[in-house]
Amino acid sequence: MPRTADDSWDIATSVGATAVMVALARAAETASETPLIRDQFAEPLVSTPELAAVREQVAAWWAQTDDDDDPDFTVDSQQMTDYLAVRTHFFDSYFIDAVAAGIRQVVILAAGLDSRAYRLDWPGGTTVYEIDLPKVLDYKEHTLARHGAAPVAALRAVPVDLRHDWPQALRDAGFQTSLPTAWLAEGLLPFLPAAAQHALFTAIDANSATGSRVAVEMFGVDEDARRAAEERAQRWARQRAKRQARGQDTSFDPFDLWFDDEGQPDPADWFAAHGWTTDSVQAGAEALRLGRTAHSQEGPFVNRFVTAGKP
């Protein structure tokens, strides 16, 4: 279903369902023989009865059949699992480095089913703020509580839409602008229109003390990437029609939920222009460094992981 400026969701619908897909990949990676990451909370979060339909929809999206005549475009579940494992490992390391440098205030934007507050070894005095829609945060809190899980850090939920005045909601939850902060925007940018992306970066900058850090998953925004995305959308439309004719479930497709409006900022350029020291790592290179073969130079492995520090 196309996005609208004021749409909303719970964990089983729209953008919320993409968090389930990501957690399914983390659960699969954790259960593998040589996992890059260990997320013992992913499987409990995605195995509830209320998510049965979403699990089936994601499985159908990941499925490959002999009739799929565009194998370069067909979603490969192992490719996605590998990519999301590499991504999770990178941003886990980012937080570990941040707290080692003395940062004790953490903000996870669009937290979804992120379990880092529960599974990372946070030093005493660390506070983790999770921002997402109320129904998404409620689902995670109640599900983990039923499994007896308790956060390692002080966890504060901030139930607010990132398209609204989330900085005020964050401050109301106890966030202190005078303290250095480690921010994370993982898997977020495509789900925000360009204006909201600019506003997000502006708010991060305005609420960051000296010594703060930010990490952002960067999706292609240049003209070549935009044209490639349009071509992929056309190819997927043809493939979707064939799958529908075979009776396959095509109701889940994260790309349907992305905004593709003009003017989306490059986070590395944006933060550099605002005085931050930036670095950027291509996901494919990071995968190779970790011993995971990037399946292709297409798809998610062309994404970049951007980090920046405020002097």
UniProtKB/Swiss-Prot annotation:
One of its GO terms (molecular function) is methyltransferase activity. It is an enzyme of class 2 (transferase). The keyword Transmembrane helix does not apply. S-adenosyl-L-methionine binds at residues 132, 161-162. InterPro entries: Ppm1/Ppm2/Tcmp, SAM-dependent_MTases_sf, SAM_mthyl_Trfase_ML2640-like. It comes from the Bacteria. Its EC number is 2.1.1.-. PANTHER family: S-ADENOSYL-L-METHIONINE-DEPENDENT METHYLTRANSFERASE YKTD-RELATED, S-ADENOSYL-L-METHIONINE-DEPENDENT METHYLTRANSFERASES SUPERFAMILY PROTEIN. Belongs to the UPF0677 family. Exhibits S-adenosyl-L-methionine-dependent methyltransferase activity. This is Putative S-adenosyl-L-methionine-dependent methyltransferase MMAR_0358. It comes from Mycobacterium marinum (strain ATCC BAA-535 / M).
